[in-house]
Amino acid sequence: MGPGVTDWANAATSWLGYNATYPLTPCGYCNEFGNFTGVKDLVIQECTAQDGTNTVATHTFKVPRWRGFDNPFGDIWTNLDGVVIVRAAANEISTVYTTTNVSEFTDVVGEKTVAGYEVASDGYIKAFDLGETAEIIPSAVGGSTTTYICDYHYCNTSSTALRTLRVGGDALYGGIAGLGSFNSSGNGVGYAYSNVGFRTLNRVS
């Protein structure tokens, strides 16, 4: 799937200047691929940056669609509903709680169940802990951009706050981003920023 929408700098002459690190890819951009997999060019034309002074040069992204999902990684971070991560003490592994019950998509552990345990180290992922309902949770680091999982894990080992989970990476993360990129780096459950979003589902009856 190539680099996806992950290879733009966060600068006044690139992503920051273009739209202040908000999403780049229009919804449904790769719908022509249906439920299949493919890559489509997205061209950002040269324009004046938001500061009115700098120029944003033309940039071409390779937008991936994987089995019907646009941008399975990149563009912006995806915040996952129904996940709360808890670390009892600094530098210890974290417990990952999940649920598929929409009434439990809250900012507390509540009735969520333990899906697995997250390693207390940042780095390229070497192994996953696999949950009973297909959760993949980094259990070891020590890989690289070309070995093992090839995606990055952030966790902020000193944080003991309840944390949310972001996955995928955004438009400036390059080789750190990917399908398995896992970021619980101390961002509390109420974290919000321009480069973080979520996926929605439309049920057609």
PLM region spans:
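C-terminal, surface-exposed recognition/capping segments
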Residues: 15-16, 32, 36, 56, ...
